[in-house]
Amino acid sequence: MQLTVLENLKKENVEIYLEYLNSCKSSNWETWETTYKTYCNNFKLFLVWFQNSYKNRLLLSKDTLLEMPSIMENYRNYCRSLGNSKRTLMNKTTAISTFYAWCVRRNKIKYHPFSEKLDRLRFTEKDKVKNSYFLTTEQILTVRLYMQVESKKYDLQDRILWELFLDSACRISAIQNLKMEQLDLENGYFKDVKEKEGYIVNAFFFQKCKELIKEWIQYRTENGIDVNWFFVTKYGKIYKQMTQGAIRNRIRKLGMILGIEDLYPHSLRKTAINLINNLAGLGLASSYANHSSSGVTSKHYIAKANPTEI
């Protein structure tokens, strides 16, 4: 997990947070690159804001702990001014709260500074629902063919992301963390893919995706892209792992082909699982989704009588 962003922050705050991360890693190895990666990123955002807003304050100083409820309210307001949803705000608050809970357990502080002291975020039905789209086969083919024709607007990674999300039904965290060494091109899958809750699965892909991956491998060779991450972004002259934000932006761009302004990778996952259910039944769909029970699949991943379908 890269922590270079922390280098310019107050040393004492960084040290205690790194100690916390190391502790988490020892007991949560399976989810270190998924759940705790999100916690880490959320806490880094808070640390940057905290230093900019409160200068040389220490995270565990007496005055900081006393003022923490007000500090958290200020941070909430800051996040809302950036357009963060209530759900995102809750996740960011949780990342900070778990850090302070750990500090209490390790006797670094005597009490949690804002537990049960903040007003609860009130969620309406509008807050709870993010638009989900169950795409049709026609829509899937439309995007595929449009990218093929408009090859200057959409690169190989756009095309592979589209096919791979729909073929594998994997979550964005799993797709983002794919590495070249996991690829079994001949047999059509990435092996040892880490999914939510520590599940280790194979991410399968089919013929069209296989052809695009062959092109991508050739392109990487010709252009000297010698990094292990499968999906990459160029920063200056250096290729690095593509971020989840960049992947979301690419999928959102592809959604615009269909006139959908808020298409997310999770809608592609839902589409894939829904299509499998229609073809082969709920049991196989649930298994392919790596769900612990078919109830989760049925409730959240299968198109109802009147789905949002364009």
Predicted regions and their residues:
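N-terminal core-binding DNA-recognition domain of tyrosine recombinases/integrases
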Residues: 16-130
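DNA breakage-rejoining catalytic core of tyrosine-based enzymes
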Residues: 124-142, 197-208, 224-228
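C-terminal catalytic core of tyrosine-transesterase DNA break-rejoin enzymes
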Residues: 163, 167, 269-291
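Basic, Lys/Arg- and aromatic-enriched nucleic-acid-binding interface segment
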Residues: 137-172
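Conserved tyrosine-mediated DNA breakage-rejoining catalytic core shared by Y-recombinases
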Residues: 168, 172-173, 177-211
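Catalytic-site neighborhood detector that most strongly recognizes the C-terminal catalytic loop/helix
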Residues: 194-196, 289-310
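Short, polar N-cap/turn motifs at the start of nucleic acid-interacting alpha helices
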Residues: 183-185, 261-262, 279-300
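C-terminal catalytic core of Y-nucleophile DNA break-rejoin enzymes
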Residues: 195-215, 227-250
